[in-house]
Amino acid sequence: MAHSFQLGFQDATSPIMEELLHFHDHTLMIVFLISSLVLYIITLMLTTKLTHTSTMDAQEVETVWTILPAIILILIALPSLRILYLMDEINTPSLTVKTMGHQWYWSYEYTDYEDLNFDSYMIPTADLKPGELRLLEVDNRVVLPMELPIRMLISSEDVLHSWAVPSLGLKTDAIPGRLNQATLMSTRPGLYYGQCSEICGSNHSFMPIVLELVPLKHFENWSTSMI
């Protein structure tokens, strides 16, 4: 999860988030090289007193600065498209959970079970127990099995919301009248926090998301106790 004065991303908990971190590093390296080259050229032009006669009108230079950006864009686009397809629909999810955004809480329905659904509200600061996180704890956590592909169906009952869990690389808009889809798979157990990431009204900051990823046996025991 995030902490004070954090400069980087949260630790990756899913294969998709690991891919996104690698893509971020790849893109940042390209940006750094471009910036260094531009600064070098600017410095060179400002410090030299000589001017090459063909600098302002050279066919070779124009060819280079046309082809080079095209190559750079391809180097960025190819891994980006790969990740985009990896994030696309999975054919056989082990579990499907429907998420509905409300002003200002989330409701969840486990569609593979006959009657397993609940609302998830933020716990007020005055009711927090020692060690619990302010503005991030909820009364009902979303318990999910780890190391299994899970499909999230996301929509809204009222206004635009956005269901986001950074450590899993998830951010999907919740739009009234439209059902969006996201897939997740956690590589390790734990609690993973997120928040609504679309301004949705006065209490937008008070609708957190808490996922509890557990081994399959623990999930089966929990689901049995909830039905």
Curated annotation (Swiss-Prot):
Major location category of this protein: mitochondrion
Subcellular location: Mitochondrion inner membrane
Co-factor requirement: Cu cation
Bound cofactor: record note: Binds a dinuclear copper A center per subunit.
Keywords: Copper, Electron transport, Magnesium, Membrane, Metal-binding, Mitochondrion, Mitochondrion inner membrane, Respiratory chain, Translocase, Transmembrane, Transmembrane helix, Transport
Keyword Mitochondrion assigned: yes
Binding, Cu cation A1: 161, 196, 200, 207
Residue numbers on the Mitochondrial intermembrane membrane side: 1-14, 88-227
GO CC aspect terms: mitochondrial inner membrane; respiratory chain complex IV
Annotated residues for binding of Cu cation A2: 196, 198, 200, 204
Spans through the membrane: 15-45, 60-87
Residues bound to Mg(2+): 198
Catalytic activity: 4 Fe(II)-[cytochrome c] + O2 + 8 H(+)(in) = 4 Fe(III)-[cytochrome c] + 2 H2O + 4 H(+)(out)
Topology within the bilayer: Multi-pass membrane protein
Function text: Component of the cytochrome c oxidase, the last enzyme in the mitochondrial electron transport chain which drives oxidative phosphorylation. The respiratory chain contains 3 multisubunit complexes succinate dehydrogenase (complex II, CII), ubiquinol-cytochrome c oxidoreductase (cytochrome b-c1 complex, complex III, CIII) and cytochrome c oxidase (complex IV, CIV), that cooperate to transfer electrons derived from NADH and succinate to molecular oxygen, creating an electrochemical gradient over the inner membrane that drives transmembrane transport and the ATP synthase.
Family: Belongs to the cytochrome c oxidase subunit 2 family.
Quaternary state and interactors: Component of the cytochrome c oxidase (complex IV, CIV), a multisubunit enzyme composed of 14 subunits. The complex is composed of a catalytic core of 3 subunits MT-CO1, MT-CO2 and MT-CO3, encoded in the mitochondrial DNA, and 11 supernumerary subunits COX4I, COX5A, COX5B, COX6A, COX6B, COX6C, COX7A, COX7B, COX7C, COX8 and NDUFA4, which are encoded in the nuclear genome.
The protein, known as: Cytochrome c oxidase subunit 2
Source organism of this protein record: Cephalopachus bancanus
Organism lineage: Eukaryota, Metazoa, Chordata, Craniata, Vertebrata
